Amino acid sequence: YVFKISSAAEKRSILDLQHAALDHLGTEFGDGVWPCACRTRNRKIITRINGPDDTRYMVRMLTYVTGTPLVDTKPHSPQLLQNLGTFLGRMSRSFERFTHTETQKELIWNPDNGPDVIHTYVEHITDHKKQSMVEYYGSAYESVVGPVLPTMRRSIIHNDANDHNVLIADAEPDNPTSWRKQVVCLIDFGDIARSYTIGELAVAMAYAMLGKAEPISAAAHVVKGYHAEYPLNE
């Protein structure tokens, strides 16, 4: 089990969104793929406890999903990266049928807020070369991507498919000679938000490229799997 203690500043509606999304995905994907909420004796999913300073904290317990984080799985074969894309594409298709009143609109990690975040914090980058690079790509995003944003699909997105949140397991557990791996789960829904659906893929691509000798090729494998499951039209 995983026992989660939320920040005292956390909004209840955000936790409700996380659990509603998990319930939705659990129904669409089947039992055992996603963490499930455990209820208290009073049948509550979320309850409150007092901290050492009498501050009230929301707590909950989730089932534990077995798997190895992608960051600890080597190598990242083309098959595995494509499987990651397929998994995310299936999730994006599922989220087309999911809505919630909470959208985490103000979340700093919401892709909607990217340009504002860059404008607000770029001055704090002390390395002038890196600062110029961020300004360049921030400007390019606004001039090239900005005009087409109104035409892009929007949905709830997990928004954090980094290599610590993607869990991997054997694709053929009953075959001891097989080295094939597959994605079995995506954990940590803390950054879930309503934004551009393509952001789901963008986050995964960024992390898939890290430390790769051929980063563009690694990203392409993720895109291939995603597109096969959830065709891109952007």
Stretch-by-stretch model annotation:
Residues 99-100, 116-159, 169-181:
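An alpha-helical support segment within catalytic cores of ATP-dependent transferases
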Residues 43, 55, 59-73, 116-124:
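A glycine-centered beta->alpha junction motif in the catalytic cores
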Residues 197-231:
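Active-site activation/catalytic loop segments of kinase-like enzymes and analogous catalytic loops
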Residues 41, 74-130, 154:
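A cross-family kinase active-site recognition segment
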Residues 2:
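Glycine-rich ATP phosphate-binding loop
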Residues 8, 67, 184, 192-194, ...:
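Activation segment
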Residues 5-56, 73, 78-82:
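A conserved alpha-helical element in kinase catalytic cores
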Residues 165-200:
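Catalytic activation segment of kinase domains across protein kinase-like and atypical kinase folds
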